[in-house]
Amino acid sequence: MTQNLLDQFGTPKTRVKNAISALRYGHGIIVLDNEDRENEGDLIFSGETMTTEQMALTIRYGSGIVCLCITESKRKQLKLPMMVQNNTSKFGTNFTVTIEAAEGISTGVSAKDRLTTIRAAINDNAKPSDLNRPGHIFPLQAHKNGILGRIGHTEAAIEFVTLAGFKPAGIICELTNRNGTMSKVPDIIKFSKLKKMTIVTIRDLIQYISR
């Protein structure tokens, strides 16, 4: 059903190329996962290019849980412990402890403050002391084998931003409806047209990198 609804946005290869191009130009994209998984759509941005306005849009239309997708090496660089030692979440989502920039913010919750935290974390020379814990940004460690190791939005974000030429640091947040429910495909397609955002699936991405 999902693939049929997405045919209007081109072939899977076209959708992936459009998504990569959108990210290169500093835009966000919408990524759908599989129908037999979460069956939800996430807003995805590059941590390097995301603007305060884009963060505000993400907070307004998303769940409010803004996540920073990073590699294991970045997590170790920042000395961020995992949120739990025994991960029992359904899809094995690898949350670390939450973070906040140590400098340059007020309460940490505003769009501007959250972006300041992200920039501090993804800086190539970032040190553990640059971040306070806990905070309002939720880092996620991606699988070491990327999207082929785990079919999740975390890994998709890393794959997409690196394909676009950026460092492996992606921002994700689940889209929600006004009534508080999670957005499903028909709602997500309407949103993508309203905000003129490229829409693509994780299945599209896997086909693209496996070609």
Curated annotation (Swiss-Prot):
Residues the UniProt record annotates as site (Essential for catalytic activity):
H136, E174
Needed cofactors, names only, are:
Mg(2+); Mn(2+)
User: Which Gene3D superfamilies did the record assign?
Assistant: DHBP synthase
UniProt entry keywords in alphabetical sequence: Lyase, Magnesium, Manganese, Metal-binding, Riboflavin biosynthesis
Q: In which pathway does it act?
A: Cofactor biosynthesis; riboflavin biosynthesis; 2-hydroxy-3-oxobutyl phosphate from D-ribulose 5-phosphate: step 1/1
Task: Output this protein's name.
Answer: 3,4-dihydroxy-2-butanone 4-phosphate synthase
User: What is the species of this protein?
Assistant: Buchnera aphidicola subsp. Baizongia pistaciae (strain Bp)
Q: InterPro entries under this entry?
A: DHBP_synth_RibB-like_a/b_dom, DHBP_synthase_RibB
Question: What does the record's cofactor remark say about binding?
Answer: Binds 2 divalent metal cations per subunit. Magnesium or manganese.
Protein family membership: Belongs to the DHBP synthase family.
Q: GO molecular-function annotation terms? A: 3,4-dihydroxy-2-butanone-4-phosphate synthase activity; magnesium ion binding; manganese ion binding
Q: How does it assemble?
A: Homodimer.
